[in-house]
Each structure stands twice: as structure tokens, then as C-alpha cells.
Regions:
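N-terminal amphipathic alpha-helical interaction or autoinhibitory segments
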Residues: 19-44
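Short, charge-enriched, intrinsically disordered boundary segments that mark the beginning
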Residues: 1-13
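Positively biased amphipathic helices and basic secretion/translocation or surface-docking motifs
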Residues: 1-4, 53-88, 95-98
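Contiguous mid-protein beta-loop-alpha structural module that forms a pocket-lining wall or clamp
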Residues: 126-127, 159-221
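Short, contiguous alpha-helical
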Residues: 10, 24, 105-150, 201-256
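Short cysteine/histidine-rich zinc-coordinating motifs and their immediately flanking basic loops
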Residues: 46-51
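C-terminal interaction segments
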Residues: 5, 283-334
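Conserved small-residue-rich
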Residues: 78-146, 270-274, 291, 302-305
């Protein structure tokens, strides 16, 4: 029964968007008729979809469900037109803005680590600040007192702690307003609008990457924490649109390849439905093959799967496969 309940709960967003598979159409509605909590959650999702999609015109033909979902993700209020590298961040920000009204009266709900919903938004305010400062955007919180020589992991953790402590002295609405304003400023920056302006490399979080890639990192974190908050509130959050998901995957593969280095036992790594890469040494034969679903791979990189539990397919040298999985899991900073 628990498995059936959890399975239906994961389908409620698709139900609200009218995007259920035919087989699910036979199971979800009967469950909603019997389960008061799922029915209430489903109705909240439906209200959100109506708000995002705007008033319906009865003079226009009904669109396929997949088109409805794509349109919602593209046209959520406040999502600006940006260059392709910033589009995943714009969508993730819009998604979190759409979810946060559901947190009203529930800001103290535990989410992840020792954070509640309020603290999770404060963390995102602190996390986005690093890129914002680099792009000349004014800080929304008191200046950092962390010494310049501190390692990035220490600085990252302490800044989050300081900002959370500061934001606990303010209302959740004030924290959300500052996070939202900072995100909007990032998306209005020249670097978000022009790929050429975002091509130069900068060092953030210990990684020297083009500014364009740092926008994708921001998208990754915003989506992961949106999913965290959704789970805490009992709401299923849809994954990123496919194009955006693949941008996250490709960047994560590049970072994983750098982390493994050129001497690691070579593994042919593939993501279901997409590309494949050789990770590790290019000077010796491939020792193993590893296949992951794109969403599971992102959740592994994001610290929401462990190397032991992430679903995967593998052949060949198990030690080489294990090395890739453990290195991927070790990259999580979220």
C-alpha cells in the first residue's frame, strides 16, 4: 500500500498538467477518490498550473499535454529571455518561485541537512551571492567576514551558516524577496543575456569554469533544493525540461572527468538516451562500461543518491566502476 501511495504521489504533478500515461490514468484518479491527503495535494498542484498557464481561451484548440507542460515551464511569471547557458537557471528560479507559495505557514518544515524551508532559501541566497558579487551585483546580506585565505569549502559552509543566522532574524517573506531579487539581477546581467560576455573563465567554489558554466551550476543547485523543498512539503517537483537536464548532465560529466584525472582506470560512461564518454586514462583500453539514467546521474552528483544506491548498469571491472561512482558522489556540495 505504501508503495502504491508513494507511486501515485510522484505522479500528481503529471496529473495536474494532464500528462499522465494511459496506464496511470487507470490508477491515479481512483486513488485520489480514496486518499484525502493526495487529493488535497493534487488540487494544490492543479491551482498552481492554472495560475502559471493563465486564463484559458475556449476559442483555441486544446494542446497536447506535453506542450502544456513545456509552455508552463517556459512562461512562468518572471522568467526572462536569456541566452541558452542561463536558460536552465531561469527555469529553475521560476520553478522555485512557483513552489514557494505552498510553504506558507510551513516555513519550519525540515528539508535537508539541518535546514528548514526558510534556511534552505537563505542558503540559496548565500550560494548565488558568489556569482552575483563576481558580476558586480550588490549583496543582499551583510558583507562576509571570512578571511580571504580560507579554502572554498570552509568559506562556502561558513557563509551559508552566517546568512542563515542573519535571515532567521527576518521573516521568510523578506528572505524570499531578497533571494528572488538577487536571482532576477543575475538573470538581467549582461553575462546572462550574451554568450560572448559569459565565455571568460572565473574561479568559484574551487572550480575554474566559464561564467556560462557557473550559471548552469546555479541552475543545478536551485533545482536540487526545489526538489528538496517539494519532498519536504509532500509535493512532487517535475525534473528540469529535457534540454536543460542535458545541459546539467554535460557539465557534470566534464567536472567528473576533471576530478577523476587522466590516470584513472578508463570507463566508458553513458547516460540513457544520450551521449557516451571515456572517463579516465586515454592511454589504455577501457576496463568497464557504466550506464546511468540522466536524472539519477544528476541526483548522484547532487548528493541525493549514494554510490551504493544509485540505479545503474555496469559491465567489466567493478573496481573501475566503483571508482567513478564514488568520485561522482564525492563531488556533492549541495
Amino acid at each position: 500500500m505504501t508503495t502504491d501511495h508513494d507511486g501515485v504521489r510522484d505522479l500528481l504533478a503529471a496529473w495536474a498538467f494532464g500528462a499522465l500515461e494511459p496506464a496511470d490514468e487507470r490508477t491515479v484518479p481512483p486513488h485520489l477518490a480514496e486518499c484525502e491527503s493526495c487529493a488535497a495535494q493534487a488540487e494544490r498542484w492543479r491551482r498552481t498550473v492554472r495560475l502559471l498557464d493563465g486564463p484559458r481561451s475556449y476559442d483555441t484548440p486544446e494542446r497536447p499535454a506535453s506542450d502544456v507542460l513545456s509552455a508552463v515551464l517556459r512562461t512562468r511569471p518572471g522568467a526572462p529571455r536569456v541566452a541558452a547557458h542561463a536558460a536552465p537557471y531561469a527555469a529553475a528560479v521560476a520553478g522555485l518561485k512557483a513552489l514557494l507559495p505552498e510553504a506558507a505557514g510551513r516555513w519550519g518544515t525540515p528539508v535537508v541537512h539541518d535546514w528548514d524551508v526558510h534556511a534552505t532559501i537563505a542558503h540559496l541566497l548565500a550560494a548565488d551571492e558568489h556569482l552575483a558579487r563576481l558580476l558586480g551585483i550588490d549583496a543582499r546580506v551583510p558583507p562576509s567576514t571570512i578571511a580571504d585565505g580560507a579554502g572554498w569549502t570552509e568559506a562556502w559552509s561558513r557563509r551559508t551558516e552566517d546568512v542563515i543566522a542573519h535571515e532567521y532574524g527576518r521573516s521568510p517573506d523578506e528572505t524570499v524577496a531578497d533571494w528572488s531579487a538577487q536571482a532576477d539581477a543575475l538573470l538581467a546581467s549582461p553575462e546572462a543575456l550574451d554568450a560572448e560576455r559569459a565565455a571568460h573563465a572565473v574561479t568559484l567554489m574551487g572550480a575554474r569554469l566559464p561564467v556560462a558554466d557557473h550559471f548552469v551550476v546555479r541552475a543545478f543547485e536551485a533545482w536540487i533544493h526545489t526538489d528538496d523543498i517539494g519532498r519536504a512539503l509532500g509535493l512532487a517537483v517535475p525534473p528540469p525540461p529535457e534540454q536543460h537536464l542535458w545541459q546539467l548532465v554535460r557539465l557534470a560529466v566534464r567536472i567528473l572527468g576533471l576530478a577523476l584525472g587522466p590516470t584513472a582506470p578508463p570507463v566508458l560512461f553513458a547516460v540513457t538516451g544520450g551521449e557516451e564518454w571515456v572517463l579516465g586514462s586515454e592511454d589504455e583500453p577501457v576496463r568497464a562500461e557504466l550506464v546511468l539514467d540522466p536524472l539519477d546521474f544528476c541526483l548522484l552528483i547532487g548528493g541525493r543518491h549514494t554510490a551504493d544506491e544509485v540505479p545503474h548498469g555496469a559491465t567489466g571491472d567493478r573496481t573501475a566502476v566503483r571508482n567513478v561512482l564514488e568520485r561522482a558522489a564525492s563531488l556533492a556540495w549541495l
